[in-house]
Swiss-Prot record:
Disulfide bonds: none annotated. GO terms for molecular function: ATP binding. Component of the chromatin remodeling INO80 complex. Exists as monomers and dimers, but the dimer is most probably the biologically relevant form required for stable interactions with histones that exploits the twofold symmetry of the nucleosome core. Belongs to the actin family. ARP8 subfamily. One of its GO terms (cellular component) is cytoplasm. Pfam families: Actin. Keywords: ATP-binding, Chromatin regulator, Coiled coil, Cytoplasm, Cytoskeleton, DNA damage, DNA recombination, DNA repair, Nucleotide-binding, Nucleus, Transcription, Transcription regulation. It is found in: Nucleus; Cytoplasm, Cytoskeleton. Residues 762-804 form a coiled coil. This is Actin-related protein 8.
């Protein structure tokens, strides 16, 4: 069955697809390109003589004949078109033969020319509206699918360099903090383990930075006699034929990136962003599903050489994200089993597949450094712990945009131009040759992002302590004016790579270039603020009814039993007490829908008193203040269960290890004040999607196309500690996960990232250790004072000998460097970028997974409820 299984891993950067028997998948960039509609000019004829009247019957006959031959191919205005039936000795049938095939001929019902006329040609825009879908099994020469009419970006917006970069504003202080963090991190890095070669690099300027070469045609290989005699039994790997972009109007992957440079004829877009459906660019959801299905069919046929008619004999392993939405999973299952006609489908999560892909079955913390997001989760022997799932709304694409922004020059649209130019010179001191010109505009389009992404991959590293290394970058770009010329650019760069690499721990900088929005997170989570009680009193029933109306009875993956029981409890309480109906709904609907907690049965007076005690200690800007509040929260753990709503907006998290003043709001609850490892009693609720659908997702003031409520923007080092701290296990087990960190994805290939990440995590642990030492000293002083007061009271009252309590002699063990990475034990033939796909291929071939395959017959015969029991998560 190995050769009959196709593994699909559709991530934010690329579509990885291939047979399970293959060792490496076909990597296809996640782009679709379509050719824009062409404006066709049609000839119209104007008359100069007096017309004669024609009967309406003749005009109707001519119109019916023309409409029968042309069904909805092109649209032409009927009232503004005049067709000469007898002009210059020609008939209507002759005129029809001379006009384009797709033109519909119409006539005026009251006018008919009788004599010679002078013809002039005028242009008229015609809209082509295809009706049939593309047959993917045939050679892809034209696209007949009317997907472009359902996409909002038919006409791309103005260039981003003009429209978007004017809004990008990176504060000078924030860039200085990043540079200072680079310097302090450099002091803690281990020495470089290779020989430093000191060379004087060439300084490039406007005169010597650009050269060109002539592109030579590839010669066809001729078969020799020796090759004919030595015939191998294994067939050569299938290589798709190159496409002629002038003959097609649909392509994906690298072809879509190549044609996206010609913005006048093509436009490129992504159907999936951040590993979720990109519904923001489509007018209808069905058109988006058709687009994704067509992309999968095209990829299977072109890159795997498997026609879509043969997919009925193949099974599919689909690798989903860790926090997959249940309704999205239902749609993916329908597309794979009904549209693509696979026999069966098997789902596994990314973190589990990544651990199997690198042959690691022990306890590990899997970190996927992706293109548009970073996923963090703890895996224990093939089981993903749901409380530890975290997703950061930034990734390698934001680093690429930041690099392009710094290399091409800072934005000069601000009034303080001199200050911005000085900041640009401090970061990038050298000349960069590839910039916008009158011939082309360098922006954030797919083609130019791919150019700067290659620059980032070749030059970005985290060896900050190698001061003698001078980076000289070289890249090639095809000349836009001469097709046979390839321009070669050379440039110098040093500090700019350090700032870009260290910005991975500063989400405030990366949020300027897309990804998850912090402001949106504040708006979507502001429902938890009880100060807006008037909003809930008026609209709380509307929100609850809206959630019930969005309930999908056909969804086998969603369990709404807790909502139904909640509704029954509210109805019984309303019947008992009708006077306090509004208060009951306010206290229960908010606590159950926002926090998804059924244990809020205490009085409202006790919760308000606890809120007043914790409002002053809820907002802090560094790790030390979090640890100071942790002791108070643990002492009053029973009273703090009802304070989630009032103290929600007071929680903040530091943006970096060295930035104690600037804070980033996050989506943490009030109980999750300390992402601490050493405190086993402090539990942090997970912000990721649980196995049951949470009502919080359905109750939003503003809708989001990309489900941004699943993403948080906190630094990477703090997110790792937060994920491990959410383990409901002892401190010893938590240390095992920290000592076995697995980095996968494209970002894991950056040289030196393990050492920098180890230093940043160690800083956070050291701050927590210092805070714990301070707490221990304060507790010890309080115990000594209480002992002295007790002794004085005993001496004043009686002189009898009594035993006095002694302070506890427990001490905090010193912090040890127990942070380790599992990447050093991975085999050299394993690519971290394909770890998820490789794990899916391994799991799809196991005999033990046959029982959890979802078959097509089970999905079509109304047995959808059985699919819930077959999910491995």
């Amino acid at each position: 069955m190995e050769s009959k299984v196709i593994v699909i891993h559709h991530g934010s950067h690329s579509l990885k697809i291939g047979l399970a028997s293959e060792s490496v998948p076909k990597t296809i960039p996640n782009y679709i390109a379509r050719k824009k509609k062409e404006k066709i000019s049609t000839p119209t004829i104007t008359t100069t003589e007096t017309p004669t009247i024609v009967s309406p019957v003749e005009s109707t006959i001519i119109n019916n004949k023309s409409n029968e031959n042309n069904d909805d191919i092109m649209k032409i205005d009927v009232e503004n078109t005049v067709t000469p039936s007898e002009a210059v000795g020609t008939t209507t049938e002759d005129v029809k033969s001379t006009l384009p095939m797709a033109t519909t001929i119409t006539t005026d019902e009251q006018v008919k020319p009788t004599s010679s006329t002078s013809s002039t040609s005028t242009t008229e825009e015609v809209e082509i509206k295809p009706t049939e879908s593309m047959d993917i099994d045939k050679p892809i020469t034209d696209s007949k699918t009317n997907i472009t009419s359902n996409i909002k970006i038919e006409q791309p917006p103005p260039p981003i360099n003009i429209q978007t970069q004017t809004k990008i504003h990176i504060p000078k202080k924030l860039l200085e903090e990043v540079e200072q963090s680079v310097k302090e991190t450099t002091k803690l890095l281990p020495p470089v383990d290779y020989i430093k070669v000191r060379q004087k690099p060439t300084l490039y300027n406007e005169n010597n930075s650009t050269t060109f070469e002539i592109i030579k045609k590839k010669k066809k290989k001729t078969s020799s006699l020796s090759s004919l005699t030595n015939v191998s039994t294994t067939p050569p790997p299938y290589v798709p034929q190159p496409l002629n972009y002038n003959e097609i109007d649909y392509c994906i992957g690298d072809d879509a990136i190549a044609v996206s440079r010609d913005k006048d004829k093509w436009f490129a877009y992504q159907p999936i962003t951040m590993s979720t459906f990109n519904t923001g660019i489509y007018h209808s959801v069905q058109s988006m599903f058709d687009d994704i299905t067509q992309m999968w069919k095209y990829a299977i046929q072109r890159y795997l050489n498997i026609p879509s008619s043969d997919l009925s004999s193949y099974g599919c392993v689909y690798v989903v994200t860790d926090n997959i939405d249940r309704k999205s999973l239902k749609q993916i299952t329908t597309l794979l089993l009904k549209e693509l006609q696979f026999t069966s489908v098997l789902f596994f999560q990314e973190s589990i597949c990544s651990s199997f892909g690198v042959s690691m079955a022990t306890q590990s913390c899997v970190i996927d450094l992706g293109h548009q997001k970073i996923s963090i989760a703890c895996v224990d022997e093939g089981y993903l712990l749901p409380n530890t799932r975290l997703t950061l709304g930034y990734g390698g694409e934001q680093l690429t945009k930041l690099l392009e922004y710094l290399l091409t020059g800072m934005d000069k649209s601000d009034s303080d131009t001199l200050t911005r130019q000085m900041v640009a010179k401090q970061i990038h001191k050298y000349y960069f040759p590839f910039k916008s010109s009158i011939y082309e505009l360098v922006d954030f389009s797919p083609f130019y992002l791919n150019v700067f992404d290659n620059i980032k991959i070749e030059n970005l590293d985290y060896y900050y302590n190698d001061f003698q290394k001078q980076r000289v970058g070289t890249f090639k770009v095809k000349d836009i004016k001469h097709d046979k010329h390839m321009n070669i650019y050379h440039f110098n760069a040093d500090e700019v790579y350090q700032v870009v690499g260290m910005s991975l721990f500063y989400p405030n900088i990366l949020s300027q270039f897309g990804g998850s929005s912090v402001n949106y997170l504040i708006k979507s989570r502001s429902l938890a603020n009880t100060s807006e009680s008037n909003l809930y009193v008026e609209d709380q029933k509307h929100y609850y009814n809206h959630y019930l109306s969005s309930y999908d009875h056909e969804d086998p993956f969603d369990d709404h039993s807790h909502i139904l029981s909640f509704a029954q409890n509210n109805t019984s309480r309303d019947n008992k007490d009708g006077s306090n109906n509004n208060n009951i709904i306010n206290n229960n609907i908010i606590n159950n829908i926002i926090n998804n907690n059924n244990n809020n049965n205490n009085n409202s007076s006790s919760s308000s008193n606890n809120n007043n005690n914790n409002n002053n200690s809820g907002s802090n800007s560094n790790i030390n203040s979090y640890n100071n509040n942790n002791n108070n929260n643990n002492n009053n753990n029973n009273n703090n269960n009802n304070n989630n709503n009032n103290s929600f907006n007071n929680v903040t998290i530091v943006t970096s290890t060295l930035n104690s003043n600037s804070t980033v709001p996050s989506t943490l609850n009030s109980n999750s004040t300390v992402p601490s490892i050493s405190n086993s009693n402090s539990t942090v609720p997970s912000t990721s999607t649980s196995t049951t659908s949470s009502p919080t997702k359905k109750l939003k003031i503003e809708s989001s196309s990309n489900c941004e409520d699943n993403y948080i923007d906190i630094p990477l080092d703090i997110a790792i500690l937060k994920s491990v701290s959410q383990l409901e296990r002892s401190d010893i087990n938590k240390k095992k996960y920290l000592s076995n960190i697995l980095l996968v994805g494209g970002g894991a290939l950056a040289p030196g990232i393990q050492d920098v990440l180890r230093v940043c995590i160690f800083k956070q642990l050291e701050q927590q250790y210092q805070a714990q030492q301070l707490q221990f000293q304060q507790q010890l002083q309080q115990q000594q004072q209480q002992q002295q007061q007790l002794q004085q009271q005993l001496q004043n009252s009686t002189n009898s000998a009594t035993t006095t309590p002694t302070p506890s002699s427990t001490t905090i063990m010193p912090l040890e460097n127990y942070i380790g990475f599992a990447n050093s034990s991975i085999r050299s033939d394993v690519d971290c970028r394909h770890a998820g796909w490789r794990g899916g291929a391994i799991l799809g071939c196991l005999e033990s997974t046959r029982e959890i395959w979802i078959t097509r017959s089970e999905w079509q015969d109304g047995k959808n409820s059985s699919a819930l029991n077959k999910l491995p998560f």
